[in-house]
From Swiss-Prot:
Coiled coil: none annotated. It comes from Human cytomegalovirus (strain Merlin). One of its GO terms (cellular component) is membrane. It is found in: Host endoplasmic reticulum membrane; Host Golgi apparatus membrane. Interacts with host MICA and ULBP3. The chain crosses the membrane at residues 271-288. Residues 289-305 are cytoplasmic. Participates in the inhibition of the host immune response. Prevents host NK cell-mediated lysis of the infected cell by preventing the KLRK1 ligand 3/ULBP3 trafficking to the cell surface. Also retains another KLRK1 ligand, MHC class I-related chain A/MICA, in the Golgi apparatus to avoid its surface expression. This is Membrane glycoprotein UL142. Residues 20-270 are lumenal. It is a single-pass membrane protein. Gene3D superfamilies: MHC class I-like antigen recognition-like (3.30.500.10). It comes from the Viruses. Residues 1-19 form the signal peptide.
């Protein structure tokens, strides 16, 4: 049975080339209910009613393996494991083609759509155990009642220890571990208490800046605290303040954090959290617990003056 989803988002704004431009997105996916869980679709970006960029993508599990590649770079940390087609087609805004850098700021909406609408096609089971001094969790992905992947991790390691039931069914790369971590964190975070965020951050301007890229000012002076949203409740953590104006294709800041506890209970696990904010997506390297192990996540800050 063919299932079609379509979703429109209007009234979103981005500061590009010194002016405010109204954006709308159209997401469309087609899913066949078959042994191969694959969705073909497109992402279209409209600026003031004019088609700005369209990406044609294929997301899903092919007949042989669950692909670990991406359509475009800015999508990598969101749903790398589920993007099958690395190529894409882009329709620029003719003479104002530079406006396509809006994708890097708003791509979170695209990924959220795929996560909420399509990824439910997979049966996902993940458990979290924080009773010991180091967190232990298990992640298992099933497709059509077949174990495609089982992951078990004890503590925060450079790489997850994993067992693929059939190694040909899952192409596990270090980059797509990010998405798995994100899922696991959603399950675990509701059980976390009494932690504080210590900003120990550095910033790096993206390279390969060329004149053709639009100048976008990223006003990143967030409030004193932002709220972490999870399945059951909200937590508040402190965020750093910084200002950056780049002539770049992507707004990327490499930020390192150390998350520690408010309590003096040394037997409790060191934990982490993913603050979810507003429009600007920033790549962050989080250093977890006493191991200081780098794990890639996406960190969002509030945008505006």
């Amino acid at each position: 049975m063919r299932i079609e989803w379509a979703c429109w988002l209007f009234g979103y704004f981005v500061s590009s080339v010194g002016s405010e431009r109204s954006l709308s997105y159209r997401y469309h996916l087609e899913s066949n209910s078959s042994a191969n869980v694959v969705c073909n679709g497109n992402i279209s970006v409209f600026v003031n009613g004019t088609l700005g960029v369209r990406y044609n993508i294929t997301v899903g599990i092919s007949s042989s393996l669950l692909i670990g590649h991406l359509t475009i770079q800015t999508l990598e940390s969101w749903f790398t494991p589920w993007v099958q087609n690395k190529s894409y087609s882009k329709q620029p805004l003719s003479t104002t083609e530079t406006l396509y850098n809006i994708d890097s700021e708003n791509i979170h909406r695209v990924s959220q759509y795929f996560h909420t609408r399509w990824i439910k096609s997979l049966q996902e089971n993940h458990t979290c155990d924080l009773t010991n001094s180091t967190p232990t969790y298990t992640y298992q992905a099933n497709v059509n009642n077949t174990n495609y992947l089982t992951l078990t991790s004890s503590g925060w390691q450079d790489r997850l220890n994993y067992t693929a039931i059939n190694s040909t069914h899952f192409n596990l790369t270090e980059s797509n571990i990010t998405s798995i971590h994100k899922y696991l964190n959603t399950t675990c975070i509701e059980r976390l208490r009494n932690y504080t965020l210590e900003p120990v951050y550095t910033t790096a301007v993206p390279q390969n800046v060329t004149p053709e890229h639009a100048i976008t000012t990223l006003y990143t002076t967030p409030p004193n605290a932002i709220t972490i949203k999870d399945t059951t409740q909200s937590h508040t953590v402190q965020t750093p303040s910084f200002n950056d104006t780049h002539n770049v294709t992507e707004h990327t800041l490499n930020i390192s954090y150390v998350l520690s506890q408010k309590t003096n209970n040394t037997t409790s696990p060191w934990v982490y959290a993913i603050p979810m904010g507003a429009t600007a997506t920033i790549g962050a390297g989080l250093y977890i617990g006493k191991h200081f192990t780098p794990v890639k996540f996406v960190y969002e800050v509030w945008r505006g003056q």
